[in-house]
C-alpha cells in the first residue's frame, strides 16, 4: 500500500493524467513523466519512503483504434520511453531502482521489453547500485520472459550494476 494517490490528489497532479487522456498519440502517448519524491509505502507494519516515477507506457493494444503503428516505430517509442525513465532515475540520484514489466499489460511483448531494459541498463551500468524487477510470477509468462532475457533469476531479480 502507498500514499501515491494521496500525493497525486493533494498536489493536483491529475491534470497530468487528464492531459495524457486528451493527447493519446495513437495510443503511444508522449514522453512525459512525473517524478514524485518521498512517497510513503506500507507493508506488514513497516513503512518506508520511496521516490516514484510515473510515465505512460506505449499502449499497443489501443493502437487498433487509431492509425496503425509499425513494429519498428513501436520498438523505438518503447526504447525511448524506457531510456527516459532510467535517465530520470539517474538524474535524481536514485541508487536502488524497482521496475516492472513496463507496457506488458498494454500489449507490449515481455521478451522485447526485457531486451530493451537490458540494453538501456547496460548503457547506464554505473548509474545504479541495484535494479530489481518486481514482476509477479503469473500465468501471463512475463516473469519467465524477463528471467530468460536476464539469463538467471539472481541477475534478473536483483540486477546489480557494475
Identify the function of each model-found stretch.
Residues 1-162:
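Macrodomain-like recognition of ADP-ribose-binding/processing modules
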Amino acid at each position: 500500500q502507498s500514499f501515491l494517490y494521496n500525493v497525486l490528489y493533494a498536489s493536483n497532479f491529475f491534470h497530468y493524467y487528464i492531459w495524457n487522456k486528451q493527447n493519446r498519440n495513437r495510443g503511444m502517448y508522449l514522453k512525459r513523466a512525473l517524478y514524485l519524491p518521498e512517497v510513503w509505502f506500507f507493508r506488514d507494519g513497516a513503512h518506508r519512503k520511496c521516490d516514484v516515477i510515473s510515465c505512460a507506457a506505449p499502449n499497443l493494444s489501443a493502437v487498433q483504434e487509431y492509425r496503425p503503428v509499425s513494429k519498428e516505430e513501436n520498438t523505438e517509442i518503447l526504447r525511448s520511453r524506457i531510456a527516459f525513465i532510467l535517465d530520470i532515475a539517474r538524474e535524481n540520484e536514485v541508487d536502488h531502482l524497482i521496475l516492472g514489466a513496463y507496457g506488458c499489460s498494454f500489449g507490449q511483448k515481455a521478451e522485447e521489453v526485457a531486451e530493451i531494459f537490458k540494453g538501456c541498463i547496460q548503457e547506464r551500468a554505473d548509474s545504479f547500485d541495484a535494479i530489481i524487477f518486481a514482476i509477479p510470477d503469473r500465468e501471463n509468462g512475463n516473469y519467465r520472459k524477463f528471467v530468460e532475457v536476464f539469463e538467471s533469476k539472481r541477475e534478473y531479480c536483483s540486477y546489480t550494476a557494475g
